[in-house]
Amino acid sequence: PLIVEIMAHSSTQDTVSSESVQATAGANIPPADSQARVSAFMKRIQDSICQRLEELDSEHQFLEDSWERPEGGGGRSRVVKQGNLLEQGGVNFSEIWGDRLPPSILAQRPEAAGHRFYATGTSMVLHPRNPYIPTVHLNYRYFEAGPVWWFGGGIDLTPYYPFEEDAAHFHRTLKQTCDAHHSDYYPTFKKWCDEYFYLKHRQETRGVGGIFFDYQDGRGQLYRGPAEEGPAAQYSNQIGELPTRSWEDIFAFVQDCGDAFLPSYVPIIERRRDTEYGDRQRDFQLYRRGRYVEFNLVYDRGTIFGLQTNGRTESILMSLPPLVRWEYCFEPEPDTHESKLYDVFLKPQEWADWIESSA
């Protein structure tokens, strides 16, 4: 649920100074048609993703559940179940508006007071059936209240079996997209993604990461997260504040990120979907899916906030896989594909720089 995502992230964001916030007022204002344009984009990427996935598995179509928010807004939830390609997947669009801003946002952006707010976004989680195809997660969102606005989101990949060429292709596609807008976007947002999708109690990343960003309004430093001593913050501090980028600049970047999903992921599907697997691979996939559940229920701010504030439970938990298993003190056998996942793929790597001959 979008308002859950916005409020949860705003309640933990504490690194944007009041000076930079005040500088937003009166400058870099969104265009008059900003909301309509972002809404159209969010719907378009939902449509294009669903259409391409249905082409890849023509026997199983997404079922749409449209809903309306009495206070203003609504959305389209699309879910596929028990497909040949996707065991379960969801691609959701939502947009909401209203007069009452969440206190957590007003505390961070006081100049938003007195303005109506608007928020929209598209989110997606795909759980493939074949263990050799990675799970993938995408989320892009936009918030606006008068002179205050920002974009956030990202995309990350969670493989169950280690294929360097897949991780490299995914990251290179994202890096190429980011580099077309600014050379510091990818290194910052890649590090931010590794930081966010980390299971502290397991001391491992959720997968091979991707990119993650929030509070991007074209001003100040790129990193706006809570880990002030982490690699993303260190890199962001090193490059300093970037020149002001316009609303159009940031929107163009987010559009390109959304459009990069299919070329980043579909080639992996096509490369792995016909690979045969047995009980061993299926059992390991279900075991590793447990990490996805653990992250969402223990660390994901949107999930936690939604459950604590009586949000729509079915929507909040829709990202969870349909089947999962846990095993006490599981250890992969040495020198296996499963152990390689732990040794290499669940630690931050510079996948965009991977060279095949080094594998």
Regions found by a protein language model. Give the residues of each.
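Short, Lys/Arg-enriched N-terminal segments with co-localized hydrophobic residues
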Residues: 1-6
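TerminUS-proximal long segments
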Residues: 18-21, 26, 309-359
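Gly/Pro-rich turn-and-neighbor structural signature
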Residues: 30-109, 239-278, 282-292
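Aromatic/basic-lined ligand-recognition segments
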Residues: 71-97, 194-235, 290-297, 305
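Internal mixed beta-strand/loop scaffold within catalytic domains of large alpha/beta enzymes
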Residues: 77-153
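Short conserved micro-motifs at the rims of enzyme active sites and ligand-binding pockets
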Residues: 104-106, 222-224, 304-310, 328
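Long, contiguous internal "core" modules enriched in hydrophobic/ aromatic residues
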Residues: 149-275
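C-terminal, helix-dominated tail/subdomain
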Residues: 281-325
